[in-house]
Curated annotation (Swiss-Prot):
Residue stretches of biased makeup (Low complexity): 67-86, 100-118, 218-299
Chief location bin: nucleus
Presence of keyword Transcription: yes
GO biological process: positive regulation of transcription by RNA polymerase II; transcription by RNA polymerase II
GO cellular component labels: nucleus
Organism, scientific name: Dictyostelium discoideum
Biased composition (Pro residues): 119-128
Record-given protein name: Putative mediator of RNA polymerase II transcription subunit 19
Described purpose of this protein according to its UniProt entry: Component of the Mediator complex, a coactivator involved in the regulated transcription of nearly all RNA polymerase II-dependent genes. Mediator functions as a bridge to convey information from gene-specific regulatory proteins to the basal RNA polymerase II transcription machinery. Mediator is recruited to promoters by direct interactions with regulatory proteins and serves as a scaffold for the assembly of a functional preinitiation complex with RNA polymerase II and the general transcription factors.
Highest rank taxon of the organism: Eukaryota
Family in the record: Belongs to the Mediator complex subunit 19 family.
Keyword Ribonucleoprotein: no
Length: 299
């Protein structure tokens, strides 16, 4: 395959039909820019790109089919012509066996006059189809005219026809997903500084450390103090609960003691009352006895 197949034909101004399209092309100077684009840019990128397309094999197969079919048609036509000539010659020989030569010449002239001369017309070429139409054909589509009518600058045309060889382009979804991981903390020695250089240095004492280290230790101490305070508070709560329970038990014990004392006092009071009652009864008996002794008999 020739290398000219991969190059777009130069755009030339048609002198016969001057229409609005040609005036626009002249106005925006697109003839020059497009021709330069075809000669410079496409010769390097587009040509190498199209050569590696999988459709090249298809174009070759399609070409071989056309060539084989045309050669077979030519062979068939030649064979048919030879057969017809042979049959005509043999038929004329059979008919002209018992005819004098003058009459044979007259008959041949009459046959030539009856059969008008038919010039051999070549078969019209079939328009190419498939990928060959895109690569080899000089057919201009209506959409192509609309593309040419666009008022584009040279840089815009180049960017429009430039092949993107940047490799895989990440979609926006992946970019949004990766934004979450950007705020991670940086690892040590990320910028190439080796750990061996820092290992030789002596460890800094607490006095030599920057303020941030003191702050870090203070924060640890504060955290430990907070934890101790929380433990003390828990202990206080336990003591408070224990004291409350002990006080509550003491109060119950005191109440029981008071209740028992009151019961005993009541019992004692009742006993005292009973004793008083007994004493009163004894006094009454004694009074009765006295009264009985003082009885006088009246005459």
């Amino acid at each position: 395959m020739s290398s000219s197949l991969y190059l777009i034909n130069p755009i030339e101004k048609s002198s016969e039909n001057i229409t609005g399209e040609t005036n626009l092309l002249e106005h925006f100077n697109l003839y020059k820019t497009l021709n330069e684009f075809n000669s410079k840019h496409l010769s390097s990128t587009y040509k190498s790109y199209v050569k590696n397309l999988p459709g090249d094999n298809y174009i070759k197969r399609e070409k071989s089919k056309h060539s084989s079919s045309s050669s077979s048609n030519n062979n068939n036509n030649s064979n048919n012509n030879n057969n017809s000539n042979n049959t005509n010659a043999s038929g004329q020989q059979d008919v002209n066996m018992g005819v004098p030569p003058q009459q044979q010449q007259q008959q041949q002239q009459q046959q030539q006059q009856q059969q008008p001369q038919q010039p051999q017309q070549p078969e019209p070429p079939k328009p190419p189809g498939g990928l060959t139409r895109l690569v080899e054909g000089n057919f201009f589509d209506e959409n192509q005219q609309e593309l040419i009518l666009l008022s584009l600058d040279d840089s815009q045309l180049r960017s429009a026809f430039t092949l993107l060889d940047g490799g895989y382009q990440r979609p926006d979804k992946d970019k949004k997903r990766d934004k979450k991981h950007r705020d991670k903390k940086k690892r040590k020695h990320r910028d190439g500084s080796s750990s061996s250089s820092t290992s030789g240095e002596k460890k800094k004492s607490k006095k030599d450390r920057p303020d941030g280290s003191h702050h870090h230790s203070n924060s640890n101490n504060n955290n430990s103090g907070n934890s101790m305070n929380s433990n003390n508070m828990n202990n206080n709560n336990l003591n408070h609960n224990n004291n409350n329970n002990m006080n509550h038990n003491n109060m119950n014990h005191n109440n029981n003691m008071n209740h028992n004392n009151n019961m005993n006092n009541n019992m004692n009071n009742n006993n005292n009352n009973n004793n008083n009652n007994n004493n009163n009864n004894n006094n009454n008996n004694m009074n009765n006895n006295n009264n009985g002794g003082n009885i006088t008999v009246e005459h």
